């Protein structure tokens, strides 16, 4: 589940420590007055930056450990990666502060990945930023992006990088990631989140639960059949019609209704009306969605919930 990490280790007691000697593609400089070294390089797939105050290591755990990055690292694999980094760099990387953390999973799906993007609508606390033929992204925190949720076509990514998928994966592979981009320790309610904590069972389970909770916070649309006998409490024809029409729209189209009206200054100084509009759209869509067969949405919901419920 844990994929990309960014680790920072301070070692102010040794400003002349030459990390570059252990790196590939090493580029270094030295302060001739103090002997302080700084530079960069790579270690397998990891990018390494260092100076007299410390070292920053960033990259994919899966890419570091395995020749094929479609293999999903387990909790124990993270511990192995930290141990290997410590040995290769001759530094106690288990003490490093985690300043970025990505958690993700990918699945074989019934349909191509981009068929699921239109079913994922607005999300609590997140802005739905962009949807392309291969990627859907949500972000929180404005320009600083403290958190990012991303759904993308894993099969195409592997193909573009010239790395075949593992046996068992077909052409329709969808990946969902949650990325904690900043203030990671604070977001998890910890004074300091160090690399050694990443393999702690309680922490790991809480991380996977947050990954699942963020997914659940996304409102879903659908294409489906309706169980008409159960719809007796939908009293108004307009409620049914509006809900069906809204659910037939792509998620981005629904969200753009509010933006279009804001750009046109429809409500003038009555800015609170836009919040009412958004709530009205969500409520009308929800009127009949509980009676629908979700199809692709059900499939994705089940995939995510299965990972959360069976986390090891």
Predicted regions and their residues:
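Structured, helix-rich domain cores that form ligand/interaction pockets
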Residues: 1-257, 304-312
């Amino acid at each position: 589940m844990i994929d990309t990490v960014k680790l920072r280790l301070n070692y102010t007691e040794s400003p002349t420590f030459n990390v570059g000697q252990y790196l590939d593609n090493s580029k270094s400089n030295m302060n001739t007055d103090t002997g302080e070294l700084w530079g960069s390089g790579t270690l397998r797939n990891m990018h390494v930056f260092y100076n007299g105050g410390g070292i920053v290591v960033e990259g994919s755990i899966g890419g570091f450990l395995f020749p094929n990055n479609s293999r999903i690292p387990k909790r124990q694999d993270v511990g192995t990666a930290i141990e290997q980094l410590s040995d290769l760099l001759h530094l106690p990387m288990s003490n490093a502060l985690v300043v970025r953390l990505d958690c993700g999973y990918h699945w074989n799906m019934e349909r191509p990945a981009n068929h699921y993007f239109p079913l994922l609508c607005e999300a609590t606390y997140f802005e739905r930023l962009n949807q392309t033929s291969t990627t859907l992204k949500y972000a929180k925190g404005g320009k600083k992006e403290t958190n990012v949720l991303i759904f993308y076509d894993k099969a195409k990514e592997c193909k573009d990088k010239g790395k075949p998928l593992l046996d068992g994966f077909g052409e329709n592979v969808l990946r969902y990631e949650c990325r904690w981009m900043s203030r990671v320790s604070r977001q998890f309610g910890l004074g300091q989140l160090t690399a050694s904590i990443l393999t702690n069972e309680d922490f790991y389970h809480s991380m996977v639960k947050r990954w699942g909770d963020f997914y659940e916070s996304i409102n879903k649309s659908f294409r489906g059949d309706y169980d008409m006998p159960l719809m007796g409490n939908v009293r108004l024809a307009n409620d049914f019609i509006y809900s069906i029409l809204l659910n037939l729209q792509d998620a981005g189209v629904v969200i753009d209704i509010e933006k279009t009206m804001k750009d046109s200054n429809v409500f003038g100084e009555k800015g609170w009306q836009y919040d009412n509009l958004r709530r009205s759209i969500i409520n009308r869509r929800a009127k009949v969605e509980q009676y629908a067969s979700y199809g692709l949405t059900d499939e994705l919901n089940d995939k995510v919930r299965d990972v959360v419920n069976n986390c090891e």
